[in-house]
Regions:
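Coiled-coil dimerization/phosphotransfer module
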Residues: 1-145
Length: 145
């Protein structure tokens, strides 16, 4: 039971903050998937966003990474978080196989739908661009005020 709770809400969010928790998560992904080059960029202070934003941002990034590993067959992924005065912009860009976005609208892709729903629950915006054989680019912009 403790393991399930830890997976739902890692204690490191409270103890280390969002930036260190994400860095730790990226290190885990990198060690488990050594063929995948993970590039993490954090600009601005993302550690004072509040509990609700923190857990949702953590889950968004986790799901984006999961999608890359399961579906994209990418060799690189760039995750960037940019905190400005009023927003947090998250970008996840991979060089994987990409997909036809019209298929996404016809089927229920739960991972991407979950990311979109989390962004919308925070009054944020979700955008996805994908080209077959060229990769996928997710952009999430969340208001922080």
């Amino acid at each position: 039971m403790h393991n399930i709770i830890r997976q739902l809400r890692p204690g490191s969010l409270d103890n280390l903050g969002l930036s260190e928790t994400i860095k730790d998560e990226m290190n885990k992904w990198q060690s488990q998937h050594q063929a995948l080059k993970v590039n993490l960029i954090i600009k601005g202070n993302i550690d004072l966003l509040g509990e609700v934003i923190n857990i949702n941002v953590y889950r968004i990034i986790q799901e984006a990474m999961n999608n890359v590993v399961k579906h994209a067959k990418a060799s690189t992924i760039k995750i960037s978080l940019l905190k400005t005065k009023d927003t947090l912009k998250i970008e996840c860009i991979d060089n994987g196989k990409g997909f036809d976005l019209t298929i996404l609208k016809k089927t229920k892709q739960f991972g991407l739908m979950g990311i979109k729903e989390r962004a919308q629950a925070l009054s944020g915006k979700f955008d996805i661009k994908s080209n077959e054989k060229k990769g996928t680019h997710l952009t999430i912009v969340i208001p922080t005020k």
